[in-house]
Amino acid sequence: MRVLVQRVTSAQVTVDGEVVGRIEPNPQGLVALVGVTHGDDDATARALADKLWRLRILDGERSAADLGAPILVVSQFTLYADTAKGRRPSWSAAAPGPVAEPLVDAFAATLRELGATVATGRFGAHMHVELTNDGPVTLLLES
């Protein structure tokens, strides 16, 4: 599993003109773009969610857990693109939807269980993600 994390001051996801997820942090929140690969499981999703929740990347070296910062979770299979050969990416390392969707859901559910305010995109949809990156701070978490 890969989670591309961005520290933000605002973020929202729109599908077909409808806002399906939005966070309005005060002052900061996180956007987590989540990619799932073969071999990932519920334990992987839970461990990375816990790491994200406690990761000290907000102002004052504090975490989302410390500040109650909201998190927008968006599935993104393209995090597993293989661009080593040719000009067309291969997606073979990305888990198929029926495998990936429950794990992205488990990731978001774990964050909620830990106390996070979580908004989400819509799995499998063509999404428009708008965010204001703060810093900028962008990190890649991997299992």
Swiss-Prot record:
GO cellular component terms attached to this protein's record: cytoplasm
Keywords recorded for this protein, A-Z: Cytoplasm, Hydrolase, RNA-binding, tRNA-binding
Principal EC category: hydrolase
CDD domains for this protein: Dtyr_deacylase
Keyword Metal-binding carried by entry: no
Catalysed reactions listed for this entry: glycyl-tRNA(Ala) + H2O = tRNA(Ala) + glycine + H(+); a D-aminoacyl-tRNA + H2O = a tRNA + a D-alpha-amino acid + H(+)
EC number, UniProt record: 3.1.1.96
Motif (Gly-cisPro motif, important for rejection of L-amino acids) on chain: 135-136
Domain of life: Bacteria
SUPFAM superfamilies assigned: DTD-like
Main localization, broad class: cytoplasm
Compartments (UniProt record): Cytoplasm
Biological process (GO), any one: D-amino acid catabolic process
UniProt record similarity statement: Belongs to the DTD family.
Entry-linked HAMAP family: Deacylase_Dtd
Function text: An aminoacyl-tRNA editing enzyme that deacylates mischarged D-aminoacyl-tRNAs. Also deacylates mischarged glycyl-tRNA(Ala), protecting cells against glycine mischarging by AlaRS. Acts via tRNA-based rather than protein-based catalysis; rejects L-amino acids rather than detecting D-amino acids in the active site. By recycling D-aminoacyl-tRNA to D-amino acids and free tRNA molecules, this enzyme counteracts the toxicity associated with the formation of D-aminoacyl-tRNA entities in vivo and helps enforce protein L-homochirality.
PANTHER family in the cross-refs: D-AMINOACYL-TRNA DEACYLASE 1, D-TYROSYL-TRNA TYR DEACYLASE
Comment on protein domains: A Gly-cisPro motif from one monomer fits into the active site of the other monomer to allow specific chiral rejection of L-amino acids.
The protein's assembly and partners: Homodimer.
Protein name: D-aminoacyl-tRNA deacylase
